[in-house]
């Protein structure tokens, strides 16, 4: 029989610094003792696995606190296709829609509780167009994410429609620059509608990070819905430097799928990225499964973190690019990607699932995230926004837009 006192001294707990983890040790002890009763009726190996799973889950769940989602409708914000969010400063946020009538962003003022982080109020301040119609403001676009460079007053937009990462001056509203896109991330290299969904910016190192939503054509034989459930989903997180050219690739392996792929709509990919104040990279993974009858739809979200020291280690392991002009001959083969991706250190921070069925109508397809306010106790909040597809629905059931706050434990950002 496995003694609970031994498990509480397990290395996972000894290396965990969360105060809430220590407060839960007593509760975990009760859980483990209950497991011991079950263990008497199970083989030794199986019982050990059961207890270790309980211990692992109890510790893992303490890296963040996921707060209840808040519907934007209560603040008279109309349904939209909100796909990205970024802080502008002083509680103001820019929100981009992938179906906006023209290129631009919505500005919201978001008030959060200083103790809990929960959203108290959202005030819509209008739509801010970028570029005049004469300079291409009504051109075909699919704005999926955005980041704000406060030092240079630039708003960078990830456009999946033409696979570009473009900067706009917030004063003149005009295009002023763009990141060089390496050939492996060109429109021809990504599966349809699985291109640039995410964009992040690190103010400390002044580097950008983006990726295709799902594996590239060269790295996977089919879209996620056409792959075996055991097939690895590896991405090339690409980082750009101050010269606007791609500098290196960070191999990244997504978590194993949890939902059924036999569905009307199925998605599995990375819709958002966010650099934390300490240089760590937060990755949002979204898996969505919508049955043919719609009832039973699920959206499973994960927040995973690549620690700052792991980012530096990956820099040494990853492939360095001399310039975007030579990336055609890049010796970063799919086999090398699949070999390196599992070596990138990743921490599971939080996860949640939304549903649409007879009794639950919490379904929300989260696509964007950014830094929220710091709480009074120093913890960092993350704001997540969902895409309701303009309130699509039928028979009186329509999707709603939500904001959800995730409160990170101090070890994620210190």
Question: Where are the model-predicted features located?
Answer:
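Sec-dependent N-terminal signal peptides
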Residues: 40-49
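Sequence/structural signature of beta-propeller domains
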Residues: 62-414
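N-terminal signal peptide c-region/cleavage motif recognized by signal peptidases
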Residues: 55-58
